[in-house]
UniProtKB/Swiss-Prot annotation:
The entry's keywords: Amino-acid biosynthesis, Aminotransferase, Cytoplasm, Pyridoxal phosphate, Pyridoxine biosynthesis, Serine biosynthesis, Transferase
Name the UniProt record assigns to this protein: Phosphoserine aminotransferase
Cofactor annotation: pyridoxal 5'-phosphate
Assigned GO CC terms: cytoplasm
Length: 362
């Protein structure tokens, strides 16, 4: 198959074709340097300017105040599960966690290795299909931060509200939703996101952190590469940053502006998700496990009423150019991820195929 397909994978995910073409055109000779972006030193004026421009674009998109630092860090977002408690916990502290899916469960277990974490709500017994009522929890007096995952990529669960913490810093794993919907940065102490969903290719993690959270040095001392303060003081150049990822992210930030900004892509994301959910709700052939009030608009999980047909479904979808619809290995089933770069045409093609498959196999 020579033409582009629709990639419904949870990440790495689709990128806009125009961005890929731009990167292709610039690959051998970036900005008339005679070098590829992959070859240029990270402390050169060109790359320092690239990082500065990327940061400014992100600040404009999200209206990030000056009292927040923006960090471009190398590596997986999962590393933040350890970095957050290591940086933000002091002796005697206990961090509070909402466990609403696989990723927040992993984050809690990582923090609990320090024996300084407790959970406000654990939805695992119910199958991670809903979000807790926010009247049910009570924070301990020694809580330095509250952690939650607004959108659970694996389980397809989304918080319909921002938890109220009474002034305690709120930490959010926005790996699968940052830049997909409007947010008020001032409601958060720290936000982080892996880039491979809505931002760039895998290997970059963006951290947005309030300056107040950098005032206290971690106790006991932690490795310098894991210290947010070091990265903030060096403007993401404490070590070699993932330059190519930042380059693609910078292009993505500008692309989002051409799409009407965050509000524009959010409106389209809502329409895409609503269209697919409407079809799923109209048929008994497909099952949707997540309660309606907690449904993700990024990661739509579903299954077949006849599970033994799942592989046939995937094989036929692949032949139609509908890729990566298999659910996560922890949950099984099927999943369609509708990130910013997924066009409505992809959703239409998926629904057309699903309808045909249901008629032929129902």
């Amino acid at each position: 198959m020579n033409s582009r397909v629709f990639n419904f994978g949870a990440g790495p995910a689709m990128l806009p074709e125009e961005i890929l073409k731009e990167a292709q055109e610039e690959f051998l000779n970036w900005r008339n340097t005679g070098m590829s972006i992959l070859e240029i030193g990270h402390r050169t004026p060109e790359i320092i300017n690239l990082l500065s421009t990327a940061e400014q674009s992100l600040r404009e998109l999200l209206n990030i105040p000056k009292n927040y630092h923006v960090l471009f860090l190398g590596g997986a977002a999962r590393a933040q599960f350890a970095m957050i408690p290591m940086n933000l916990l002091q002796p005697g502290d206990e961090a509070a966690y909402f466990i609403t899916g696989i990723w927040s469960k992993m984050a809690y277990h990582e923090a609990n290795l320090l024996k300084q974490a407790y959970y406000l709500s654990n939805e695992e017994k119910e199958g991670f299909v809903s979000i807790p009522d926010y009247q049910k929890w009570e924070l301990k007096s020694n809580t330095p931060y509250v952690y939650y995952t607004p959108n659970e990529t694996i389980n397809g669960v989304r918080f319909p509200y921002v938890p109220k913490t009474g002034g305690v810093p709120l930490v959010a794993d926005m790996t699968s939703c940052l830049l997909s919907e409007p947010i008020n940065i001032n409601q958060y102490g720290l936000i982080f996101a892996g880039a491979q969903k809505n931002i760039a290719n895998a290997g970059l993690t963006i951290v947005i952190i309030h300056e107040d959270l950098l005032k206290n040095q971690p106790e006991p001392a932690i490795p310098t590469m894991l210290n947010y303060k070091n990265h903030a003081e060096h403007r993401s150049l404490y070590a070699t940053p993932p330059v190519f990822n930042c380059y693609l992210a910078s292009k993505m930030f500008e692309w989002i502006k051409t799409q009407g900004g965050i509000e524009g892509v959010f409106q389209r994301n809502c329409l895409k998700a609503a269209k697919l959910y409407q079809y799923l709700d109209s048929t008994d052939f497909y099952l949707t496990p997540v309660s309606k009030e907690a449904r993700s608009i990024m990661n739509i999980c579903f299954s077949l009423c006849y599970p033994d047909l799942e592989q046939k479904f995937l094989d036929m979808a692949n032949k139609r150019g509908l890729k990566a619809l298999k659910g996560h290995r922890f949950t099984g089933g099927l999943r369609a991820s509708l990130y910013n770069a997924m066009p409505m045409a992809g959703v239409d093609a998926l629904i057309e195929f699903m309808s045909e498959f249901a008629k032929e196999n129902g």
